[in-house]
Swiss-Prot record:
Renumbered residue ranges of the record's region Disordered: 35-99, 136-467
Protein name, entry field: Formin-like protein 6
Compositional bias (Low complexity): 229-243, 409-421
One Gene Ontology CC term in the entry: membrane
Chain ranges of the FH2 domain: 452-867
Biased composition, class Basic and acidic residues, residue ranges: 449-467
Superkingdom of this protein's organism: Eukaryota
Amino acid sequence: MKALQSRFFFFFFFYIFFSVSVSSEAHRRILHQPLFPESSTPPPPDFQSTPSPPLPDTPDQPFFPENPSTPQQTLFPPPPPPVSADVNGGLPIPTATTQSAKPGKKVAIVISVGIVTLGMLSALAFFLYRHKAKHASDTQKLVTGGGDGGGSRRFQEDSGPPTTTSSTFLYMGTVEPTRVSASESNGGTNGPVNSSPYRKLNSAKRSERYRPSPELQPLPPLAKPPQPSDNSPSALSPSSSSSGEECRDTAFYTPHGSAISSDDGYYTAFPRSANGSLPHSKRTSPRSKFGSAPTTAASRSPEMKHVIIPSIKQKLPPPVQPPPLRGLESDEQELPYSQNKPKFSQPPPPPNRAAFQAITQEKSPVPPPRRSPPPLQTPPPPPPPPPLAPPPPPQKRPRDFQMLRKVTNSEATTNSTTSPSRKQAFKTPSPKTKAVEEVNSVSAGSLEKSGDGDTDPSKPKLKPLHWDKVRASSDRATVWDQLKSSSFQLNEDRMEHLFGCNSGSSAPKEPVRRSVIPLAENENRVLDPKKSQNIAILLRALNVTREEVSEALTDGNPESLGAELLETLVKMAPTKEEEIKLREYSGDVSKLGTAERFLKTILDIPFAFKRVEAMLYRANFDAEVKYLRNSFQTLEEASLELKASRLFLKLLEAVLMTGNRMNVGTNRGDAIAFKLDTLLKLVDIKGVDGKTTLLHFVVQEITRSEGTTTTKDETILHGNNDGFRKQGLQVVAGLSRDLVNVKKSAGMDFDVLSSYVTKLEMGLDKLRSFLKTETTQGRFFDSMKTFLKEAEEEIRKIKGGERKALSMVKEVTEYFHGNAAREEAHPLRIFMVVRDFLGVLDNVCKEVKTMQEMSTSMGSASARSFRISATASLPVLHRYKARQDDTSSDSEHSSNSST
């Protein structure tokens, strides 16, 4: 601000100097004409004396009464011209001549310059007045309490005796209407002294940069230090770094903490010269304010060296929000302790911590609980303070706050005391607190393990029921939607008694079981634990001893063990590494496990597991050979049945005639044969009524034809028409009974049968190679050699039956499909088509039987009309047959003629 004032004065004086120099140059130009005024008459003496006095006074009157400062008076250049005019008073003729030449112009210039100068000085004085008044009010609010007193009252409070302490409060960043005192409006001699403390507090750039929230409440001051004279040099030095570090380490109250607290709080009195942490104004230079008059301020009021303001340690990072919240909680918890501080007493020197704790423990039951004052209310006056209440060290306060946030609500209520010894207990975690935290963590972990994270700890744990839960379906109704929660009540007491997990009974069993298993693992565990356990379970399920297995393997008798046991023994076969370990084991066999003892007993027999495989092959050989023999025999019989079925041939003939009639005039007409796949398409062609299909029509025709051929008596034919129709329907329905082997063959896969034959042949080759090993132990090899001869003969027969069945299947396929049989990928597909058609034919026969029963239940008239319609259909079929013969003969004749 002072740089702005000096710049303004410079431009103003430059303008005044330029205007006066112009007027002086005009005056000299007139005085440089010495011969011209001699011829003129001298002016009267009163004309010279009238305008001469205002010349030296005109530039002096607007400046000197308003600005008493002497350095600004030396900048004015106008005084020399009036002095020269007075010195040259002996030359009246030129002066009278110049003033008589242009008196009006000179007077106008002087008057205008004076008016302009007076106006500018007035504006400057008003600007300085407003500026000082505004900053004086801000400084007054920072130092004084409610703004009820002016600057003189503020200085009286600050310059009082050191034994008294100001009860006013300190504001941070608040703005009130401007208040100007008498001492600030005028620039007296005490201006520098009075402006020094306020300018230091009003160093505006720091205050604007770290301005806190406008919701701050008035904070109580702290007692001043005992001997301020010791810190006066460091307080007044602008470059003090130790005071800046002390200021940064000083804690302060947040707005909410101050609102909830009582009148007293934690404050730190520190030197005002710590410019590194003091706020400054944007419009005032810190150096200019601090350099006003430090020595005078220190000599006149030594108490003004220390100003009670909160520390701005936590204001340094303004974007971070959590630190003020932690400060709020910590301040709320520290308030009861701060109420014990004296308000108007001077604190003694800091005592040692032992004496401090001993004194405060005696006064600890006096203060109220911590959170007793409600938030956002003016607290009542504090109780009488104890004689000693120094603030705690500021370096350890953040740790106190973090510990206070971590404790639980129960610990906070039990520890809500105002003694500093309790507060210091929160600085470092005590062994008791650590023990409580460890117990809580252990109990929480045990609950998670025992309850699996989901169970209710209030209910005892039961045995689990492993089921598959079904998700709720909102689009359909299920049986679970009809269940009600109150429809069935459980006897939970009995359930807990029957299915509860007895931790007391199961706990002793667990160590006993663990003490046995590691012993076996350490001494005699050779196999994999899981595999050993599985083998032991299988042995208990089969209920067989080692001696029985050894005897069967030695004699080669598979009937004594059975195929199931032999399959289990094959699964127990150890790996080569395990076999080597078991063979090389030379310790006590009784110490081995059940599985190890069993396998070691079996491995003592030469080629034990190869014998097991050979015996398993022998046990399954007869069953597999029988299955293959029956399968190939079924295929042979199915081929013969399909070729020899007269009724199936009649059915194919009826379908062929019906198809040719329906395809007359098209490329599909005049067919001689068709694939059996066409039989499955007869049900897809429906009549006009939408119910009768082409297969229904064919069945009815075959029924009528079969009934007439089986009955030779004409009287029976015309008299009992319903009887022969029923008889014909029974003949058609018996087609499925005639082709039983065809249905069986349709479920077979010839490739699978061929793979079974190959497997038997490969097993026989293995057995033959195994019997070539030289050994004389037991009768195993003798019995196996006998079986080998029989097996070779049976396999030759099976392979012959396979070739015969395959040839017959191909023959029957060519019998019905002709040359198209070569295109069949599946050799047994013809049996599958016939099987599917027989199923559809059975359903159609049932429907036709139902229709006949409905027709016979009607009256005689309807029965006679039905007979007429039945007999009338016979000539139609004969005519159709005759027409078909004629058309076929004509087509043959035309083909012969064309050739």
